[in-house]
Amino acid sequence: MKKGSIFLMMVGIIALHTSFRLPKYYPDAAHATKDSYFVVVTKSKYELQLFDGSTGEWISSYPVVFGSKDLGDKMMQGDRKTPEGTFHIIAKKSPHKWSRFMGIDYPNAESKEKFNIRKAQGLIPSNAKIGGEIGIHGVWPHEDYAIDQYQNWTEGCISTKNNYIQELFNLLPIGTTVTIQR
C-alpha cells in the first residue's frame, strides 16, 4: 500500500512539472513580426499561453507567478499586483538580473483611465501614483523552484523559469500583444 501511494505521488509530481509545456514547433522566429504570436496570461491559473497570431492556435503554456497573492487588478504603485488589460511588448533587456526582461506598455491609456476613475471614486489615495516598469522576466539564478511552488514574489511583474523566459525572449518580437486577465 505504501509503495503504491509513493508511486502515485511521484507520478503526480512528474505530471505537475511537465503538464504546462509540451514541445512545439515554432514558426521561424527570425522572421516573426509583432502579429506572429500573441500571449494570454491568466492569473487565476498561474499560466502564460502562447498562440499563433495568424490562426489563433495554441502553441504552448508556461507556468508563471506574480507579485501579490491577491490576484486582483493593479490599483497603484507599490501594491505588488499585476495589471490586467491588453498590452504590448515595448522593450527587451538581456542580460538582466532575472535572466531576460520583456517590458510591456503599462501604464497604457486603458490603465490610466482605470487609475483615474479609481482615484476619483476614492478607492485609492489622492496622492497615489500609477507605477510602471511592468514586464515578463525570469527568476534569480537557481531559483526556478519559486515558479514550481507558485511563490508570488515580484513587484507586479510576471515571472517564469529562466529557460522559459529565454525561449520567449528569443521568439517574441517587440510589439507582440500580451493580454493579462484574472
Which residues does each predicted region cover?
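Functionally constrained cores in energy, signaling, and assembly domains
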Residues: H17, K43, T160
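Bacterial Sec-dependent signal peptides at the C-terminal "C-region" and cleavage site
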Residues: K3-S5, M10-Y25, A29-A30
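Hydrophobic alpha-helical segments, principally membrane-spanning helices and signal/leader peptides
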Residues: K2, I6, D70, G122-L123, ...
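Generic detector of leucine side chains in alpha-helical contexts
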Residues: L8, L16, L22, L48-L50, ...
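Gly/Pro-biased beta-strand-loop elements
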Residues: Y26-G135
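Exported/periplasmic cell-wall-interacting domains
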Residues: P95-R182
